[in-house]
Design a protein with these regions (language model features):
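Short acidic (Asp/Glu) patches
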Residues: 3-7, 31-43
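Short connector loops at helix/strand junctions that flank enzyme active sites
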Residues: 21, 31-33, 50-52, 135
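Active-site region of the double-stranded beta-helix
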Residues: 16-19, 31, 42, 47-48, ...
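Non-heme Fe(II)/2-oxoglutarate
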Residues: 85-86, 115-117, 121-182
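Double-stranded beta-helix
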Residues: 62-123, 147
Length: 182
């Protein structure tokens, strides 16, 4: 996730001049687990950008049976940053964005070791795991270099958060390392 090659590729996909790591996380869907409701990523984060990008790396085969990701094509163009939460209802996001209700989501199975990239504003969710095994993935969210703090704590540690004011540039290399710049 820290490699300049991956940063360069991700930056070109996002159409930005530089990328910093926002955060990474493991996503483990247990056996017979419920679906993950459709949601957007950026509204949760401590910056506001239409150009943030996430890489989702399958550690196990992600299949229709064990909860692969689903994307709603073109939904990143909605450009709203309202945090509507990840509800219990898989389709609750469409109550807020009714204009996208009839756009068919596309399942994206991916083999172990494969990766998906998505814009932080694309509607996405994951199917149920209908198997006795785990469905594991690792994600890394990248923010464009130069993003500013929007007042949301999200994953920022309290010590760093205490130093920030709304509008401050999130350029702390210890917290959000620069992985690539054009």
């Amino acid at each position: 996730m820290f490699t300049p090659e991956l940063g360069s590729f991700s930056g070109r996909v996002a159409g930005v001049d530089g990328l910093r790591i926002w955060h990474d996380q493991a996503l483990i869907k247990g056996p017979y687990a419920n679906p993950t409701a459709y949601h957007l990523d950026v509204p949760y984060w401590s910056f506001t950008s239409a150009d943030a990008i996430t890489i989702w790396v399958a550690l196990d085969d992600a299949t229709l049976e064990n909860g692969c990701l689903y994307y709603v094509p073109g939904s990143h163009k909605a450009h709203k940053f309202d945090n509507v939460g990840i509800g219990r209802e898989i389709g609750a996001l469409f109550d807020v964005y009714p204009e996208w209700h009839d756009v068919a989501a596309v399942p994206c199975p991916v083999p172990a070791g494969g990766a998906l990239f998505h814009n932080g504003l694309v509607f996405h969710g994951a199917g149920a795991n209908m198997t006795p095994g785990l469905r594991r993935a690792m994600t890394c969210a990248y923010m464009p270099d130069g993003c500013t703090f929007n007042g949301q704590a999200n994953v920022l540690p309290p010590v760093y958060l205490a130093t920030l004011s709304v509008g401050d540039v999130l350029d702390n290399d210890d917290q959000n390392p620069l992985v690539w710049h054009r």
